[in-house]
Amino acid sequence: MKIYAVLLCLLLIAVPVSPEKLTGPDKAPVTCCFHVLKLKIPLRVLKSYERINNIQCPMEAVVFQTKQGMSLCVDPTQKWVSEYMEILDQKSQILQP
């Protein structure tokens, strides 16, 4: 039951911190974050991440993908974010053949 409460809170908070698709000069879609989530996300709900550092975006960010398919923008300078990225990298290396 706790996990559902956490996910509901994340969903309500994620609306303003989910990545936006913009169109670049070559008409290719560009993912940008305009706001970042301030609270720590439980590692157990995360599946993967993507770094956002496109020059067309207003801020550098990391987008975490949850196991439920949500995308959440977070501040890459926070210590827990870099720790989670390392853990997710290790998990993905173990899963690759």
UniProtKB/Swiss-Prot annotation:
Residues 1-23 form the signal peptide. One of its GO terms (cellular component) is extracellular space. GO terms for molecular function: chemokine activity; heparin binding; phospholipase activator activity; protein kinase activity. It is found in: Secreted. CDD domains: Chemokine_CC. The keyword Secreted applies. Gene3D superfamilies: 2.40.50.40. Keywords: Chemotaxis, Cytokine, Disulfide bond, Heparin-binding, Inflammatory response, Secreted, Signal. Its main location: secreted. GO terms for biological process: calcium ion transport; cell-cell signaling; exocytosis; immune response; inflammatory response; intracellular calcium ion homeostasis; negative regulation by host of viral genome replication; positive regulation of myoblast differentiation. Belongs to the intercrine beta (chemokine CC) family. Chemotactic factor that attracts monocytes. This protein can bind heparin. This is C-C motif chemokine 8. It comes from Mus musculus (Mouse).
